[in-house]
Amino acid sequence: VINKFNVSTICGNKLLTSMLLKKNNIPTPKTYFSFSADAARENLDKVGYPLVIKPVIGSWGRNVIPLKDKDTADAIIEQREITDGPLDRIFYLQEMIDRPPRDIRVITIGDKAVTAMYRKSSDSFKTNIALGAEPEICDITNEMEDLCAKASKAVGGGILGVDLMEDKEKGLVV
């Protein structure tokens, strides 16, 4: 184990990570949590589409699903209601970011960004290497370094992979 227990706990849970990033004024996609299917549907009715639904705990892009319309959302929510996992009852929704077909993975040690790569996907909105996205070296800009240092401090430091997206209007978001 490299990172402290609390850092591993926070970074392994999107809900906890999102709350700490928001608390520390770090730009992120708009994020909505619901703890029941009815509350998730209410959020979707208020916010609209497209959104992305993600598992609170998970990696490699598994079960990350774009919700482009009400029919898709209803089907996914219904499926999650009948599964046995209690974490499936936490509906973690994020706005769909208008971005190039890539994201940026920055590796930090403490508050220092040490390396970065673009993760490019030509056929999916998911940019996970495990799902076939192609890595490409990315030069670390001052903006990236500053944002990653703030994100690292917000979650307690350690050795982290900070994922950045290039929002066409807002700039970099975590």
Predicted regions mapped to residue ranges:
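Conserved metal-phosphate-binding beta-hairpin within the catalytic cores
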Residues: 152-174
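Phosphate-binding site of ATP-dependent enzymes
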Residues: 65-152
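Short, solvent-exposed loop/turn elements at beta->coil junctions and helix N-caps
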Residues: 38, 94-97, 163-165
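Active-site nucleotide/adenylate-binding loops and adjacent lid/helix of ATP-dependent enzymes
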Residues: 8-91, 101, 142
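Generic beta-strand structural signal
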Residues: 33, 108-109, 166
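Short glycine-enriched loops at secondary-structure junctions
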Residues: 7-10, 113, 119, 165-170
